[in-house]
Amino acid sequence: MIQISRTLVVSALLILAGPVSALRAQSTGPIEGPVGPSPYNIISGWHKPFAEEGFAFGGSSGVFAESPNRIFVAQRGETRLPDPIPAEFSGFAGSIGINVLFATDMRVWEHCLYTLDSDGNVREMWDQWDHLCEGSDGPGPHRLRINPYDPERRVWLVNETFHQIYVFSNDGSELIKTLGEKNVPGDDETHFGRPQDVAFLPDGRILVADGLDNHRVIILDADGNYISEFGGFGEGPGQFNGIHALGIGPEGLIFALDRSGGRVNVFRTTNDPAEVEFVDVWGGFGLTLDIIVNDDSIWFTTFGPGRLVNFVKMDFEGNRLYTWTVPRELPDGYLEVHTFSVDSDGNLYGGDNQYGRTQKFVPKPDADPALLIKPPWVAR
């Protein structure tokens, strides 16, 4: 494992159908800095159900808006509903009190990857790849990304349970590459331990958040070959207790979410492609879930008091600029914004891994532009 130079050090309700151990694991953190209302309206009922009768969405673990009319969704299979279906069912499992994260006995590995149009209708169903998740005794697909520097716009899907990462053609017709060995965890150069995310540097290198077992970030070359790694388990600067998401910013900045540590670790690339330098760490949050980096700030999701989901904006110096809370109450509430993405029109999409659905947020007409999340930073 490479050594990270330390340039600066600055020192984490009830779930429907969730076990007590899981409740304790999902920590919350205080809200600090400016707090205000959401700058978005949620479009109620946007995600149109498509499952056969007796089934509903599973956990929405990965969302990526390639365009306003093509939104990729990775879900943890579908949810088998009780028979008879309760009258209050309104298209998603959470509406009848099912927490799909924990109701694993109701999970079926179907329709794991698909795209939606701007109105929330299914556009493409990639069920030819459902077999990549079948037989999983864990959560399965965890994150979905597209490399902004790839002219072929290949689709990357991280499978946490099988310790693998898949690379598909943009139209879903071909599985181009598989990284990792199915059901074989490891901490060497070719294996993963419950990987969580991938990110892409402008020079072609690929970063893998690896993950809940290995607590490291792996640096790969453009062809997926191992270069080096950084991180490690712990509570110190540059260490992780479950790295969950990655974001890339200007001037070589790398933001890595330490999920169970409730922190954001900041690194910077160097002239050596095998090394990064540690820059800073910002703590005091609940579980940190997903991140988007803009030109001069970051947005990430986390749990605040009462396990309410917060969107937090910070500048690159670690100052908390704004926090807004996502409602928990149905019909439009969230138990968890596990993943989020923003399209080129400024619409926000949030995947709920517990209620089991994806929703669309549109900017309010009078929203302050400074409080809106922009698409991820890309080098020009």
Spans of features found by a protein language model:
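Eukaryotic scaffold repeat domains enriched in small/polar residues
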Residues: 26-380
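Sec/Tat signal peptide C-region and signal peptidase I cleavage site
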Residues: 20-24
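Bacterial N-terminal signal peptides that target proteins for export
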Residues: 1-9
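Bacterial N-terminal signal peptides
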Residues: 9-19
